[in-house]
């Protein structure tokens, strides 16, 4: 186990390397930080940190830089999440509050995350499989034609036109609408099939075919919309960190083009706690020189999707973690209010 002093030396190395982009020497550390020991003592601590794999020298004549293991320890034990300032929080809320629908919320969130973190932002659309029904609207468009409108707790709206097997009167439409909402409003989508399976039997025989058609359309909508979607933005930010990648940023860019890879990354994030994957902790080889900071977001206690950022391992972890957490919280509030 590392002593407190060596932990402080590691903290200083990470902070200086992230801030200056240059390997850090013992003399510079003692000048910039109140370590309370001589450069010679710091050199001994550096040697011990290197022996244990927390830092490494890129060149024999250069100072040390943090390894993935060093960044891991920094994030787990030494990094305090940096809260956003009051003006920053107000700006975030104002920007997101202008969104007109769910697509706009996701698009604004991607732009916002990429801007405030200066990393690549990835935002997953809320999953219908983890959502709940807010309301089901049923409208008569013609004697034998209906419109089904499904509204989720995240503000997602799905519309379907239904051709009925027989005319369906306004009173029957109102009755079905009321019964549907009494059964499914506030319930998880995964529970809907079982909740409505006996509903046709409660209607008159002449209305049962139409009720069954409406229910089939509702359930088909759930199946159609379960495909996971995400949005990515700020890829150009990677060009600022070209020297942080061993050979080229091409493998990173190629990995970011694969939606399956990104969905898996976000899938590893915990619903409420921050998840930080550093370097080779990322299973995809193309992302082995990056760090991924992600967290779940939602309109209630349970997350309905994930968001996060991808950047080099030489990352401002306290600031990035604070920004990701703040944006996720505000997106959840916007969805709850929508």
UniProtKB/Swiss-Prot annotation:
Belongs to the HrcA family. One of its GO terms (biological process) is negative regulation of DNA-templated transcription. Pfam families: HrcA. GO terms for molecular function: DNA binding. Negative regulator of class I heat shock genes (grpE-dnaK-dnaJ and groELS operons). Prevents heat-shock induction of these operons. The keyword Transcription regulation applies. This is Heat-inducible transcription repressor HrcA. It comes from Streptomyces albus G. The keyword Transcription regulation applies. It comes from the Bacteria. Keywords: Repressor, Stress response, Transcription, Transcription regulation.
């Amino acid at each position: 186990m590392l002593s407190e002093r060596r932990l402080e030396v590691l903290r200083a190395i990470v902070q200086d390397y992230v801030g200056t982009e240059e390997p850090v020497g013992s003399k510079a550390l003692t000048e910039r930080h109140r370590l309370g020991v001589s450069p010679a003592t710091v050199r001994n601590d550096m040697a011990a940190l290197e022996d244990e794999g927390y830092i490494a020298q890129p060149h024999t004549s250069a100072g040390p830089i943090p390894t993935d293991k060093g960044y891991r320890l920094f994030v787990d034990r030494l990094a305090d999440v940096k809260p956003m300032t009051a003006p920053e929080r107000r700006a975030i809320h104002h920007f997101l509050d202008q969104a007109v629908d769910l697509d706009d919320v996701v698009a604004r969130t991607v732009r916002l995350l990429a801007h405030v973190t200066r990393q690549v932002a990835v935002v997953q659309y809320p999953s219908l499989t983890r959502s709940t029904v807010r309301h089901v609207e049923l409208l008569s468009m013609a004697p034998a034609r209906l419109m089904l409108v499904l509204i989720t707790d995240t503000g997602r709206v799905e519309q379907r036109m239904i051709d009925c097997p027989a005319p369906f009167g306004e009173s029957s439409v109102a009755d079905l609408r009321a019964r549907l909402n009494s059964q499914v409003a506030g319930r998880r989508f995964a529970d809907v099939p079982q909740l409505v399976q006996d509903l046709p039997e409660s209607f008159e025989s002449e209305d049962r075919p139409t009720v069954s058609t409406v229910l089939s359309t509702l359930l088909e909508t759930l199946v159609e919309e379960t495909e996971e979607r995400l949005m990515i933005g700020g890829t150009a930010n990677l060009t600022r960190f070209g020297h942080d990648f061993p050979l080229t940023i091409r493998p990173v860019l190629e990995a970011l083009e694969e939606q399956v890879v990104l969905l898996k990354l976000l899938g590893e994030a915990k619903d409420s706690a921050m998840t930080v994957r550093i370097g080779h902790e990322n299973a995809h080889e193309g992302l082995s020189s990056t760090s991924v900071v992600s967290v779940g977001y939602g309109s209630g206690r349970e997350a309905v999707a994930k968001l996060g950022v991808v950047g080099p391992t030489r990352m401002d972890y306290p600031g990035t973690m604070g920004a990701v957490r703040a944006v996720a919280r505000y997106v959840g509030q916007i969805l709850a209010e929508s």
